[in-house]
């Protein structure tokens, strides 16, 4: 059974000629890679990623002039296609050749910034073309090698530039806004894109590993990756249910650890940025399905940008909060009781809270400050027996904390402590009453959860000298 989202119409399900070129490059087969990438440009001179790969191979072979021509053209084609990451990648290659890239960075920033006249409502833009199946695609002849191959690739780049220049009198295409970048004005975008470097990864490469601490954010310039989370499959009795739902991969045994595919990331996707807001371990892995070109920025580089351009830091924090809210809207058991269209406005009542490792969200014997939805990180519910503390349960993103004391109107009977740096959205106690009055379904959901958790917790505390079940939860 499939444990991944279904393939979408028009999605890439087989290696493209450019995939082949990237794979050959990563394997060190540079001439073979050039035959495939240059042939891709010859077939479709609008393909920015092929222009950039061909130019990179020319640069490696010492053809700097042709490479510069190709990188500059690739940047322009990428902008016209609305692919900011590929445009930035091209500028990175130009910088490596010693080219002054200031005007190129300004061009990208002007195209994608908040006030750009080229930005348009995505609904008004024509749909992107379907991927070329490439059934009749042929790379350049294997008889071409050495200087002859380089000259042919140079000619293809030059002809591609001539075709672009022939369109000089036409209006440039409108493009869709890009998350985060198109919420910032030109100078801020200029500073932000300068923080990113380009990397190329092969199929199967683990870009982010679940459980590791992260300090980087990534953008997919070209390629496809999967977000995967390790999970322990259900008990044998649940096999049929899991297989029917497609949640148990074929050949996996219930009770074993398997990877559940949560999402696919394609061109333009920004991921890993939550590590910039929280130093919690990564909640999932990200693995390349195809050879991919990525942009990467480290936390310290982005923090330097935020210091120099405070508006960038403000928007980056707002972007991360929007992402947290969007995730909680989809996954929080509290919000599921509310109609989907009402959830975003409801979450806006919550305040963002950050906790360092060891901080207490809730203290035993005290009133809770409010209801917490865990956005990132991890907390431990801690009880005490004979003067010794023990962990009753751990809770992570999507879980709710504090509902027992609020709903049952009593003091907390356990500590809740941040295991890692943690970010929550908190609904203050004084706003809780108005929330449940407006949305009684939330009260019903929380009451059921609170009673269940309270009963389980009482059982654990009463028998704390015996082994503790991992799924007992107290909040």
Regions picked out by a protein language model, each given a short descriptive name:
Residues 55-59:
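Short acidic/polar micro-motifs centered on Gly/Asp/Asn
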Residues 2-23, 27, 31, 38, ...:
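Cytosolic regulatory regions built on CNB/CRP/Popeye-like sensor folds
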Residues 46-47:
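N-terminal assembly/attachment segments of tailed bacteriophage virion structural proteins
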């Amino acid at each position: 059974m499939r444990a991944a989202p279904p393939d979408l119409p028009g999605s890439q399900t087989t290696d493209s000629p450019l995939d082949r070129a990237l794979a050959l490059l990563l394997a060190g087969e540079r001439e073979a890679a050039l035959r495939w990438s240059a042939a891709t440009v010859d077939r479709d001179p609008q393909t920015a990623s092929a222009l950039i790969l061909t130019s990179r191979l020319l640069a490696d072979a010492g053809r700097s002039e042709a490479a510069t021509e190709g990188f500059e053209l690739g940047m322009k084609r990428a902008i016209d296609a609305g692919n900011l990451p590929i445009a930035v990648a091209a500028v990175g290659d130009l910088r490596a050749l010693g080219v002054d890239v200031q005007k190129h960075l300004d061009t990208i920033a002007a195209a994608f910034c908040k006030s750009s006249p080229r930005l348009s409502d995505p609904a008004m833009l024509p749909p992107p073309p379907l991927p070329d199946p490439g059934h009749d695609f042929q790379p350049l002849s294997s008889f071409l090698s050495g200087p002859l191959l380089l000259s042919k690739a140079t000619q293809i780049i030059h002809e591609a530039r001539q075709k672009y220049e022939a369109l000089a009198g036409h209006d440039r295409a409108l493009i869709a806004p890009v998350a985060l970048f198109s919420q910032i004005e030109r100078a801020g975008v200029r500073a932000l894109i300068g923080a990113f470097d380009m990397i190329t990864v092969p199929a199967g490469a683990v870009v982010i590993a679940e459980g590791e601490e992260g300090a980087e954010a990534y953008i997919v310039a070209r390629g496809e990756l999967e977000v995967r989370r390790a999970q322990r499959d259900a008990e044998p009795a649940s096999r049929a249910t899991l297989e029917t739902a497609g949640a148990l991969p074929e050949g996996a045994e219930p009770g074993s650890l398997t990877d559940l595919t949560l999402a696919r990331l394609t061109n333009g996707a920004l991921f890993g940025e939550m590590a910039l807001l929280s130093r919690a371990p990564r909640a999932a892995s990200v693995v390349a399905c195809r050879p991919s070109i990525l942009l990467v920025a480290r936390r310290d580089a982005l923090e330097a940008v935020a210091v120099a351009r405070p508006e960038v830091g403000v928007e980056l924090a707002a972007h991360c909060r929007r992402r947290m809210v969007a995730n909680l809207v989809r996954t929080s058991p509290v919000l599921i009781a509310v109609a989907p269209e009402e959830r975003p406005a409801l979450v806006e009542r919550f305040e963002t809270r950050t906790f360092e490792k060891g901080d207490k969200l809730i203290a035993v014997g005290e009133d809770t400050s409010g209801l917490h939805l865990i956005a990132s990180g991890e907390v431990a519910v801690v009880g005490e027996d004979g003067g010794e503390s023990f962990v009753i349960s751990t809770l992570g993103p999507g879980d709710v904390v504090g509902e027992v004391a609020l709903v049952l109107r009593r003091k907390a009977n356990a500590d809740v402590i941040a295991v890692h740096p943690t970010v929550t959205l908190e609904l203050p106690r004084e706003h809780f009453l108005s929330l449940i009055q407006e949305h009684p379904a939330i009260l019903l959901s929380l009451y059921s959860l609170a009673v269940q958790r309270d009963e389980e917790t009482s059982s654990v505390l009463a028998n704390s000298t015996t082994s503790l079940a991992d799924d007992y939860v107290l909040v």
